[in-house]
Amino acid sequence: MKKLLLIPAFMAMFFAGSVAAPATFAAQPAPPQESKMMLPPPKDGKRPPMPPRMRRPQLSNAEAAEKLQSAYGYRYSDMLRLLNIGHSYGDMNTACLYAYLSGEPVEKVLQLRQPATWGRVRAQLGLTPKLYAEKYMEYQASYLPADSPVDRETALKYLRQGYPLGDILQAAKLAKESGKTLAQVLPMRTVTCDWEQVKAKLGLQQEAKQDHPFAFRGRGQRSGAGFAGLHTRNMTAERAVKIFHADYLFDEAELLPLYEKYGFEGLEDICLHAYMSKKTLQEIIELRDKYSWERMKYVLGLTPQVYFERCVDYQARRLAERMDIPQKVTKKYMHMGYAMHHINSAYLLAQKAGLDIKDVIDLKTPKNSWQDVALKIGLTVEDCREVKNKISKDFGRHE
């Protein structure tokens, strides 16, 4: 089989936009591990400046077409033609994946994309969370790297047990080097034990640790709450505990010592999995030593469809509590593929204009802004700013 193109992590998370949670069954995005580097400790009360954003080298259209052909099996000439008429490599990569998974032509997927978000496109293609996950696992197993240490059947077997492909391939490599079996090595990687630690346990040579002083997760922004923009830099314990209590409903007295032990991102992961699985925080903490986050979802019964439905319930509750948006409205539109923040903005603008959300929500496209939408429905720039400020205030952004 052709070598697998590295697909952005969010591609495997069907419900990206529902809750930007750490990982799912195929990948997403790569799940946050405890071994990730966080913000370096402050010196003299000050943190170093944020690092510049790293940009990928630009691909020529010919190079991009070759990658797409290799990843999905589409004709090189067709890929080059679509790139040459203005479609970006990023959009083409996503469109090819969705076309492959749905069985629809790439051109149809690109046409659906013009006025809509990718979440909406997935819904229009009939790619439910369950179907998306099943098809994506089959895709991963069919397009293994040329030097893959596992075959298609083995990869698919473990993918269906909640292990991400990267872990399966790494475990197979270490199993071969250590004389162990894949089944023995794969479960060794957990939330609290990364692959370098697994190597040490197996008596294998470890890679020299490199200093990554600016390896930030989310560039100092929150990554697990279904919206962007909440700054986690300079977070205080008091503020963090209030955020987690409001979002996940756990007791503040229980959250405080856990925040002091695990930090913001570590506790976010714990709260998210506990809330979605309806378990206690302590139960999830104990599972961290046994499973990776991806595998834990499988063990907890959080299939892609179940996880998505609970994400919908979660966001519907939050929008009802903070924005007075009826839960049935949020649930209806999230099931149609609209992201929570999209529903939020559309509903508030519609209210200001005396319209129904259905008359507003599709006016927002990938090529315009909510300010453009506001002006189109007879509102002013100030009206749009008021909506934006209300969302920021009620969700604690940029504090």
Protein language model regions, located:
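Positively charged n-region of N-terminal signal peptides that target proteins for export
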Residues: M1-L4
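Bacterial N-terminal signal peptides
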Residues: P8-S18
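Residue-level signature of transmembrane alpha-helix interfaces in integral membrane proteins
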Residues: S18-V19, D394
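Sec/Tat signal peptide C-region and signal peptidase I cleavage site
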Residues: V19-A26
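General marker for long, soluble alpha-helical cores
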Residues: A27-E399
